[in-house]
């Protein structure tokens, strides 16, 4: 029997590996290389250009933290833009809120969505059966450029790393358009990379520097993601009005009775308490 392993480079001398039971599918699209694997520990997982995007085992952590943090701060959010998110997990979580009226999901590569609908129904379950969701298969940077000013209450940038198709989602122009199309009390959540390895930390600081120049409130929160580089991952929270701690509406969120596996309002508070080494790196962007 072949001993097959998937390995992802996290640094020049560091790799993360998962033993693979089956290589389910492989395709080169006009945008990127897509692969689906099955493993014992992490279930089915998929990669884009050799980087893990999500696994069945730990996807709930990422998808709960990108959605429930802003929703607990402003429970009146109604119109949401998801940039990226082709696996469907972010849409699944945000559509759990009955108060959400409209979700636009902009994914550059339709094949990601269609293949996740085949191999990862755990996350893609809401993509075709909720009338509030509209999928757009185009470049997110171009979508926000022509979107209506002040239209969205929440933007969730559920993107890949700043290489390949995701590179344009880490630019000044993109963040400027996000600020413009958000309502007066709008919130932007941005995939902020990891603070640990040098190359990832560089991209984290680069993104944070651009965002904090455009929003009066710009903070960073953390979560534990076992299959991402170092396991220590960050989101950026930027807002025109709401502070993620001072305006946390814990009682309101808890009254909804949403069952989560990772997020809770106590964790919400702690997620913004960053280690000193992360604070030091963020201060270097000042």
From Swiss-Prot:
What is the originating organism of this protein?
Answer: Clostridium acetobutylicum (strain ATCC 824 / DSM 792 / JCM 1419 / IAM 19013 / LMG 5710 / NBRC 13948 / NRRL B-527 / VKM B-1787 / 2291 / W)
Q: Which family does it belong to?
A: Belongs to the spermidine/spermine synthase family.
Pfam name, any one: Spermine_synt_N
Q: Major location, coarse class?
A: cytoplasm
Positions of the catalytic residues: 158 (proton acceptor)
Could you give a single Gene Ontology term from the biological process aspect? spermidine biosynthetic process
Q: Where does spermidine bind?
A: 63, 87, 158-161
Q: What do we know about how this protein assembles, alone or with others? A: Homodimer or homotetramer.
Gene3D superfamilies recorded for this chain? Spermidine synthase, tetramerisation domain (2.30.140.10), Vaccinia Virus protein VP39 (3.40.50.150)
Q: What class of enzyme is it?
A: transferase
The identity of this protein, by name, is: Polyamine aminopropyltransferase
Keywords (A to Z) from UniProt: Cytoplasm, Polyamine biosynthesis, Spermidine biosynthesis, Transferase
Q: Give GO MF terms, alphabetically.
A: spermidine synthase activity
The PABS domain covers: 3-240
Signal peptide feature range = none
Which positions in this protein are listed as binding S-methyl-5'-thioadenosine? 32, 107, 139-140, 165
Q: What does this protein do?
A: Catalyzes the irreversible transfer of a propylamine group from the amino donor S-adenosylmethioninamine (decarboxy-AdoMet) to putrescine (1,4-diaminobutane) to yield spermidine.
Q: What is its EC number?
A: 2.5.1.16
């Amino acid at each position: 029997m072949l001993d097959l392993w998937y390995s992802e480079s996290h640094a020049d001398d560091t790799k993360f590996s998962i033993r693979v039971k089956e290589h389910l599918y492989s395709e080169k699209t006009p945008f990127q290389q897509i692969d689906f694997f099955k493993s014992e520990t992490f279930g089915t997982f998929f990669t884009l250009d050799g980087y893990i995007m999500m696994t069945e085992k730990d996807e709930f952590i990422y998808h709960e933290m990108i959605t429930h943090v802003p929703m607990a701060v402003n429970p009146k959010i109604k119109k949401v833009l998801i940039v990226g998110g082709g696996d469907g997990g972010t849409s699944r979580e945000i559509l759990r809120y009955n108060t959400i009226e409209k979700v636009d999901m902009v994914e550059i590569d339709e094949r990601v969505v269609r293949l996740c609908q085949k191999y990862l129904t755990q996350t893609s379950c809401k993509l075709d059966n909720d009338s509030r969701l509209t999928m757009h298969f185009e470049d997110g940077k171009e979508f926000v450029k022509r979107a209506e000013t002040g239209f969205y209450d929440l933007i969730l940038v559920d993107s890949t790393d700043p290489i390949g198709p995701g590179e344009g989602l880490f630019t000044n122009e993109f963040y400027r358009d996000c600020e413009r199309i958000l309502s007066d009390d709008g919130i932007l959540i941005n995939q902020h990379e990891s603070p640990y390895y040098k190359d990832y930390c560089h991209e984290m600081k680069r993104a944070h520097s651009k965002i904090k120049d455009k929003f009066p409130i710009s903070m960073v929160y953390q979560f534990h993601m076992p299959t991402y580089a170092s396991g220590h991952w960050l989101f950026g929270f930027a807002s025109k009005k709401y502070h993620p701690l001072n305006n946390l509406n814990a009682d309101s969120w808890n009254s909804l009775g949403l069952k989560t596996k990772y997020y809770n309002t106590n964790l919400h508070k702690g997620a913004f308490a960053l280690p000193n080494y992360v604070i030091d790196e963020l201060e270097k962007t000042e």
